[in-house]
Amino acid sequence: MGYPGKNHKQYATPKRRFEKTRLEDEKRLIIDYGLRNKRELWKAQSVLRKYRAGARELVALRSGGLSTEDYLKKRDQLVNHLYRYGLVGENADVGDVLALKVEQQLDRRLQTLVLRRGFARSPKQARQFITHGHIAIKGRRVTIPGYRVERAEEAEISYYGPSPLTNEVHPERSRIARAGVR
């Protein structure tokens, strides 16, 4: 058992350092999602790895003789958690959890949702708006680009109240609107 005040590593690095296909895939994802470094990508992969491990454990428990009601309870807990974060559909099963891709996890980051909702022109600008405190969820400022947005919070993303970007005539807002028209 470790000391609770100590920060622990939240990701696992790849086993092979120089694997050409993996490096190319990582580079593409970093550019597409505007990640700062590969550590952010590895964190997303580690989170998915934990979910898939939980799903595999459920399959093993089911074949190992766990009662049906206990299996359904544990499965519903896992699926409801993933549904709340928008990673699976409402009627998902263990197979859907095992089929999760890292892109689905990265799509739920605040940085990606700010870009997709039209608050920024590029992934880098979305990241900048978030870190500079221009973006809020439910009226509360969020300054973490990697914040995992729940399905219920998705509609509540907006510009932060005192931010100059709340003004419709702000020059950057007009640039964002023009970029969205193209």
From Swiss-Prot:
<comment type="similarity">
    <text>Belongs to the universal ribosomal protein uS4 family.</text>
</comment>
<comment type="subunit">
    <text>Part of the 30S ribosomal subunit. Contacts protein S5. The interaction surface between S4 and S5 is involved in control of translational fidelity.</text>
</comment>
<protein>
    <recommendedName>
        <fullName>Small ribosomal subunit protein uS4</fullName>
    </recommendedName>
</protein>
<dbReference type="InterPro" id="IPR002942">
    <property type="entry name" value="S4_RNA-bd"/>
</dbReference>
<dbReference type="GO" id="GO:0042274">
    <property type="term" value="P:ribosomal small subunit biogenesis"/>
</dbReference>
<dbReference type="InterPro" id="IPR018079">
    <property type="entry name" value="Ribosomal_uS4_CS"/>
</dbReference>
<dbReference type="GO" id="GO:0003735">
    <property type="term" value="F:structural constituent of ribosome"/>
</dbReference>
<dbReference type="InterPro" id="IPR005710">
    <property type="entry name" value="Ribosomal_uS4_euk/arc"/>
</dbReference>
<dbReference type="InterPro" id="IPR036986">
    <property type="entry name" value="S4_RNA-bd_sf"/>
</dbReference>
<keyword id="KW-0694">RNA-binding</keyword>
<dbReference type="InterPro" id="IPR022802">
    <property type="entry name" value="Ribosomal_uS4_arc"/>
</dbReference>
<dbReference type="InterPro" id="IPR001912">
    <property type="entry name" value="Ribosomal_uS4_N"/>
</dbReference>
<dbReference type="InterPro" id="IPR022801">
    <property type="entry name" value="Ribosomal_uS4"/>
</dbReference>
<feature type="domain" description="S4 RNA-binding">
    <location>
        <begin position="108"/>
        <end position="172"/>
    </location>
</feature>
<dbReference type="GO" id="GO:0015935">
    <property type="term" value="C:small ribosomal subunit"/>
</dbReference>
<comment type="function">
    <text>One of the primary rRNA binding proteins, it binds directly to 16S rRNA where it nucleates assembly of the body of the 30S subunit.</text>
</comment>
<dbReference type="Pfam" id="PF01479">
    <property type="entry name" value="S4"/>
</dbReference>
<keyword id="KW-0699">rRNA-binding</keyword>
<comment type="function">
    <text>With S5 and S12 plays an important role in translational accuracy.</text>
</comment>
<keyword id="KW-0689">Ribosomal protein</keyword>
<keyword id="KW-0687">Ribonucleoprotein</keyword>
<dbReference type="GO" id="GO:0006412">
    <property type="term" value="P:translation"/>
</dbReference>
<dbReference type="GO" id="GO:0019843">
    <property type="term" value="F:rRNA binding"/>
</dbReference>
